[in-house]
């Protein structure tokens, strides 16, 4: 997980987009949460991932990702692997990373001035983010969060304490620097756009961030051995496979019907239904999933993940 903090004009959004493009180039699935109506992640980003502008949809996606994280943890335990890299090496399944990007965390979590009846959804979003921050690093579901005015109302302890990588631009306020870095070093940064401090563990490094414009990167991002990406699927759900546990106590049954709807039901030995959900990709390898998603490009997939 990564936290990027900086005042207006510091270059915070550019760093986040740089990280976003790196994730895209490495084959990750990305979600971009932008409650400014898509100003930071405009229409050109929609071909690479879902741009979320509504709070209700953000909560829905975060809930799906929490369930996906539970699924991955379940599979990792069964296979006795510790993280996504070990899983992919052991199974050769190439389970993809998932990145959740938000340019301004305060828009999601700051409840100041919010009507009492609206606070519930803020608290639900905060709860989902806290769960992912605590549990999803090893499973390859990564949070990339930007914040302009860090304070305790936005960066709660549950979230902040589980973000190992912190990047901060210059702050005039010592308190803001303390919240992000745990020290006041950001106050002494030169007032140069793109100048940041990078902290991992106890080490803090000053650096000048890379600058690029969106138009350049849109032309640079390529797929399939250099072929330019002109049309790409809008990924709206995480890629996953169904865990099948082979032991004396549990069995699993897979029932497939149709190309776009496949019913998957896990059952106990007694035949009692444990959970079920719709998954159009069960049984496919990563290449088949990619081809299927291209055929289903721009269709609104609304899949429910079982709770393992």
Annotated model-derived regions:
Residues 84-85, 285:
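Flexible coil/linker segments and helix-coil junctions enriched in charged and small residues
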Residues 51, 139, 145-233, 237, ...:
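Conserved ATP-driven motor cores of ASCE-family P-loop NTPases powering translocation/secretion/packaging/pilus
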Residues 1-82, 92-181, 186-190, 259, ...:
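P-loop NTPase catalytic phosphate-binding loop
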Residues 87-89:
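Short, charged, amphipathic alpha-helical segments
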